[in-house]
């Protein structure tokens, strides 16, 4: 069955990082601005946008699996197959190969999705449409104004990466580091607050590399956002250790709205492995950096990323990662098995590690990280903190929110979504906390 000639409903499914979540929201806003209606799910939509991730092979193959499932479900339901658009980093990396392999209607890269309405119109006329150009963040000027959001919102301020870690495809799929203009960011932040946001997370592949011609730096941008009335919380992610400047460290002590949470990936705990990854920092420099951050904000929660099984990583070198985890005491982390990506230097390195060894190492690493997370959560028992209410819970009268340290907190309250509530933590599980409302903060 052919795709609808003029799709009237759409569904955007995003894979991967928070940047993709932001991009997916913006694509949905684009289609809504064209008069289209958001469908409840992919199987009931005329247009399905798969906003993809290319970091690991499994994520890439999931896209092709989803395409097949969508078409199969359409045949079962005796309805026209949806128009399928593949967006994001898989689209950028594979381009015409996706059209050849999966016969999709639209392929659009992460720097060109502002052209999605025109590409959909082209596909509706009967020809596949592809756009993987990489203009320097021209898309932001073409996107509609932000009019709806939840209490927590993402805001992209920087894109691309110049670090060229040997395992990573981001420099090839997102391009070089580019910072959005200061005024455009502040204007979008104000629009988000006007639309209901109480918390904004600044996004970038290397968000702490953000800067402008005036040398404002991310700390200066955060200081400007701190002055926006109605904005209660500021966060930022993801950072690179080499771009963690003194001004940004001081901001964690000086800016009250900047939450005590820092996601700072390290990837490995051994210097030889870090050098092979082209991380441009050492184990010791990373640990000393964390000491500087903790010196100005002792209660800060630390998060990170880890890769196990990087080519030629020995058992002793992996053990260095475990000792680094013990030394830091993370509040939460992401950890993955190394996945060779075509075109990256690491994919051609000798000493590729077997899947069995990677599985075993990942289990040990995650056990250590889970212990740290449980210990961090347990340490909050009896503490009072402000919780931002984000959604309803499963029980009548139960609401869910986030602590300043990015922990999920559930509590019984009559507070509304978007309220700030002072809570005493009375129960700590491995993945969430329970609290009792003590004072309702400013609405």
Segments the model singles out, each with a brief description of its role:
Residues 1-210, 247, 262, 284-295, ...:
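Proteins enriched for Cys/Gly/acidic motifs involved in redox and nucleic-acid/cofactor modification
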Residues 15, 89, 135, 160, ...:
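Generic beta-structure capping elements
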Residues 59-61, 176-181, 211-216, 276-279, ...:
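Short, solvent-exposed loop/turn segments at secondary-structure boundaries
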Residues 81-85, 93, 194-315:
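Conserved SAM/AdoMet-binding glycine-rich loop
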Residues 148-151, 161-163, 258, 268, ...:
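Short flexible coil/turn linkers enriched for glycine and charged/polar residues
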Residues 185, 202, 236, 264, ...:
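Conserved, mostly hydrophobic/aromatic
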Residues 260-261, 274-275, 298-301, 316-318, ...:
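Extended hydrophobic-aromatic, low-complexity segments
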Residues 348-443:
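Terminal RNA-binding accessory module
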């Amino acid at each position: 069955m052919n795709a609808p000639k003029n799709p009237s409903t759409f569904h955007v499914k995003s894979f991967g990082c928070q940047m993709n979540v932001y991009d997916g929201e913006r694509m949905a806003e684009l289609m809504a601005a064209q008069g289209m209606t958001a469908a409840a799910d992919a199987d009931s939509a005329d247009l399905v946008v798969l906003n993809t991730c290319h970091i690991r092979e499994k994520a890439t193959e999931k896209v092709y699996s989803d395409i097949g499932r969508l078409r199969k479900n359409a045949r079962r339901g005796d309805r026209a197959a949806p128009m399928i658009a593949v967006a994001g980093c898989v689209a950028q990396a594979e381009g015409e190969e996706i059209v050849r392999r999966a016969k999709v209607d639209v392929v659009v890269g992460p720097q060109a999705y502002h052209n999605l309405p025109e590409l959909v119109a082209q596909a509706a006329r009967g020809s596949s449409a592809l756009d993987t150009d990489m203009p320097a963040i021209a898309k932001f000027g073409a996107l509609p104004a932000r009019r709806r959001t939840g209490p927590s919102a993402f805001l992209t301020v920087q894109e691309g990466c110049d670090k060229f870690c040997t395992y990573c495809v981001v420099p090839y799929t997102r391009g070089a580091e580019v910072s959005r203009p200061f005024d455009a960011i502040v204007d979008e932040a104000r629009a988000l607050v006007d639309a209901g946001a109480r918390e904004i997370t600044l996004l970038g592949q290397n968000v702490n590399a953000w800067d402008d011609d005036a040398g404002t730096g991310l700390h200066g941008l955060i200081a400007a956002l701190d002055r926006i009335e109605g904005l209660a919380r500021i966060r930022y992610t993801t950072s690179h250790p080499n771009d963690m400047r003194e001004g940004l460290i001081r901001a964690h002590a000086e800016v009250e709205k900047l939450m005590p949470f820092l996601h700072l990936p390290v990837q490995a705990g051994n210097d030889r492995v870090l050098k092979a990854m082209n991380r441009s920092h050492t184990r010791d420099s990373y640990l000393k950096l964390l000491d500087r951050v903790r010196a100005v904000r002792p209660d800060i929660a630390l998060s990170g990323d880890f890769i196990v099984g990087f080519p030629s990583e020995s058992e002793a070198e992996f053990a260095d990662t475990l000792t680094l985890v013990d030394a830091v005491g993370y509040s939460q982390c992401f950890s993955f098995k190394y996945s060779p990506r075509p075109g990256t230097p690491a994919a051609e390195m000798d000493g590729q590690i077997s899947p069995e060894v990677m599985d075993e190492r990942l289990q040990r690493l995650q056990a250590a990280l889970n212990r740290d997370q449980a210990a961090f959560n347990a340490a909050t028992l009896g503490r009072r903190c402000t919780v931002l209410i984000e959604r309803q819970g499963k029980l009548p009268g139960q609401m869910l929110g986030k602590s300043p340290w990015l922990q999920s907190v559930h509590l019984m309250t009559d507070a509304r979504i978007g309220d700030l509530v002072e809570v005493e933590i009375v129960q700590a599980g491995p993945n969430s906390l329970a609290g009792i409302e003590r004072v309702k903060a400013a609405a």
